[in-house]
Amino acid sequence: MSLRSGLFSLFGLVANVVAADLDDFVTRQRDIALVSALNNIGPHGSMVQGAGAGIVVASPSKSDPDYFYTWTRDAALTMKMVVDEFILGNKDLQVYIEDYYHSQAIIQTVTNPSGSLLASGRGLGEAKYLVDGSRFNGAWGRPQRDGPALRAITLITYSHWLIQNGQESKVKDVIWPIIANDLSYVGQYWNSTGFDLWEEVSGSSFFTTQSQYRSLVEGNTLAQSLGVKCTACELAPDVLCFLQTFWNGEYFTANINTQTQRSGKDANVILGSISVFDIAASCDDPSIQPCHSKSLANFKILVDAFRNATLYPVNDGIPINKGVALGRYTEDVYFGGNPWYLITIGAAEFLYDAVAQWKSQGQIKVDSTSQPFFADLYPKVKGGTYQKAANLSDDYNSILSTVTAYADSFVAVAQQYIPKNGSMSEQFNKAPPGNPISASDLTWSYAAFVTMSERRAGLYPPSWTTSTKLPATCITSSKTGTYVPAIAAGAPNVTGSCSVPVSFLVNATTYYGENVYLVGNVAELGSWNVGNGQQMSASNYTSKRPLWNVDVELPGGQNVSYVYVRKQNCDQGYIYETTNRTLTVPACGTTQSLATNDAWEGPTGSSGSC
């Protein structure tokens, strides 16, 4: 044997050992991730005592940060993983799915700071709830419009399995009403701005729009199979047309129609593409699949942005054809702006998805948009179409192998920074040794690992795409939704009382660390209990106008009494206004809006010495 051939044999042996080690890690960690995700689901989850049945808790962490809530988005994505695992053969998971849709039927009816179910449906845009399913009154980025779409997708996937197994009546009578509410919300509000999946940017989000499109397409398919009408689903082409406008010529800008100034390079887009992945979709499908040329170009630009060792020291010295630790966006400062497990793992899933689609189609198309992505991994690549061939040494198979190895390298990054016990927090430190930080045992992190491992093993969710023709011109359509409590699924029979949005504005000069709350005589204002009152926002506070504000949905036509309350720092307690205020909420069915223009009346406090 020559020295050269001997070296090649040695390198091949090392590569096989590394691959086997990664295989063992994925197998072991996948089992840990699934169990850990289930441990965060009520009522029996070992990490979330007190959570209601079917409630998916974001994390057991109750401080620094407090994630002991249920987010509609996180819950839907987690349960989509659970539904997929169930369909793939784990029948023990059905009880979690049944509990989930019962809990969501109830949550849909909970009046909250975003609104109520009746008659406008605005309450469906609320981001999070307490773990018993009750409303969260704190200041937050509201509304968030991805939740209803993602929940609909999850329940539609389960519904198709039920229909295939002879339970169409259950779907039509019990589950469809939940889905119909969410689809109505999507159809009515898809073209309205809201907060993105990171809960920071108010505008139009790529991730949200992509999920909304999928929900309407799948909703239409399910409605047809049930013989029911989905009026909102008719808007799918308009949503799809709008999705194309996020492309800026180089990459997808994650958020548009926003005042927030960022580059727009954001993991939002990668996560969006894997959430709409369909192995049967073509790579030029306008739903923007992982194998789409623009998706691949966007992937390279985002990943390259995080190769900066000054930004992420853990990525120092990693070559261009290897995976790196990824965060949300390069301007991130939350908890120091670190890599996220679910995003780094999501990058691997994205690549496994693309490889699966190329294999399904038997070809790989390389154009001027995607060529830089391929060139990093396979330098001899040229523009054109690479066809599947019997010769294993051809370019088609070589590209598949290199992209698969690239995907594995992102998994290897996660392997390096996941503790030996398999626990997965939200983030890991951008500086060596890359220790876990932020919320512990993040449910979404675990769900992301399971879905990645499914794709790596060649296990794929059911197909959903249909042929949708892009309109010649994008239009800003909307259809007013019809909302009905899903009583057969366990929802309370809430009736016709409507709610009307009221903007509370008060000028109150405060010191750093002091907050202002709104309390009043109705449940939406805490029924005079400041602990359940509305925390106000100082986002528009200036020295010239010390404005605190909050938007609240109140019962239409009622007289409401309210006051403002200062919450002092250093456990100094509360200071109440010395005046009682009243207002009359506009009647139901009117287009009249109401905003107060108040000024604080009463004593003020001073900062404590803590």
Which residue ranges define each predicted feature?
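Aromatic-rich carbohydrate-binding modules that target alpha-glucans
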Residues: 508-559, 567-586
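Extended ligand-binding clefts on enzyme/binding-domain cores
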Residues: 72, 105-142, 206-213, 225-397
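CBM-like carbohydrate-recognition segments
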Residues: 45-46, 50, 60, 110, ...
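Structural helix-adjacent loops and short alpha-helical linkers that scaffold large soluble proteins
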Residues: 18-27, 85-101, 158-180, 220-240, ...
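Aromatic-rich carbohydrate-recognition surfaces in CAZymes
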Residues: 67-188, 209, 216
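Structured interaction patches on ligand/partner-binding surfaces of diverse proteins
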Residues: 568-610
